[in-house]
Amino acid sequence: MNFTLNIRNVALFFTIVFSGFYLTRVLSLSPVYITFLIGSIVIVGYGIFNFSSIHISKASVIFLLYIVYILTTQPFLNPDFNTLINVLFSLFYFIIVINISLYSNNKILIRYSKYFIWFTIVLLAIESIWRITHPVFVIEGTNKDYRDTEGMLFYAYKFSSIMFKDSNFVGTYGLVAFFYYYYLKKNRYVKSNIPLIILFLLILLTLSRSAIITVPFTIFILYFLTLKIRLYHILIGVFILILIFIIVLPQIANDGSFLSKFNILELTWLHLQKCSLFEFFLGVGFGNTFKHIGIGAHNLFVTHLIESGVIGLLFFLSVNFSLIKHTRKNSLFLTIPLFISGMSLAGHAISFYYACLALIYVIQRNERKNISINSHL
């Protein structure tokens, strides 16, 4: 049993710490896929040799139903294969992490969480240094130069990421790490503020405006969720929102990227009006948004609506909202920032998000069952 437990802890270490280890611009196969394979082998192997004692988390059920829906509908929609794999991969990542974590106590989970945070800091620091020192001035597929267009120069420092297509996706990873540590700090599992400061600086270096803006917005929302709302809280909230609009709106009113978000919503509405009932309910296939509206969705909800249909969008929302009650609302530490930043960005490969969600679920479960120091095995 000790040998089995040690093997499981090794698998847990790899799946947690490297859950965001994407190097898509450097390697044909990112390390995160290898860690997923390790976790999968351990779960299957343990299930085979310890079938009588295997325990599957109830939280996995809705994820499994979502996966079944995807597997039974997407093959008929001719999806982009890599995009489909990333969606399934991220959902399966949650199932792997949660079902390995169930056999660990919070002492182990918090320790591995710290390793994850510090590994993320090192990885994002390396990514930032490389990207900023290797700007891409010429717009891909054209002869246009970012240096020749007013207000566009900063884009040159976003497209040479070693991790993803551009630094906006790096910003999402940074957001998840930031607010996962913020959750640990608020629940007094960790003490230091240093990782939060470093992660915020690294988010700034991504130059992702959606990620940067999401940080204060999420902290503001999380703060109000802890209060018994009174009239003066509402007045303060309204005042802050008005102040933000006064300061921010003039800066982005003529911004092409900002205006394109409204164009995407308009194109989505037109698509829904002319699409078939089949496409309305089941979607057009993951990765096919551009083929149908002429532009990438750049919106988490629009992406799932168009590509997996109304049913798929409901499943996506369900797997996220189903954890709120079981985690005593702590899953909102991650879901809120993902949804806010998702209004202008849609990433299919978010294994790090689901890994941290799984950890929050198990940590809160252990607290309820008073499994904080000793594992029940």
Stretches found by the model and what they are:
Residues F51, R188-N193, P216, F220, ...:
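Hydrophobic transmembrane alpha-helices and their immediate junctions
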Residues T24-T35, T73, N78-F89, K165-V170, ...:
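Helix-loop-helix junctions and helix-breaking kinks within/between transmembrane helices
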Residues F18-I38, I54-S57, I67-F92, N105-L109, ...:
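Interfacial transmembrane-helix termini
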Residues I252-S308:
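Long extracytoplasmic/lumenal interhelical loops at the membrane interface
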Residues V42-F51, I70-I129, L184, L222, ...:
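Transmembrane alpha-helical segments and their membrane-water interfaces
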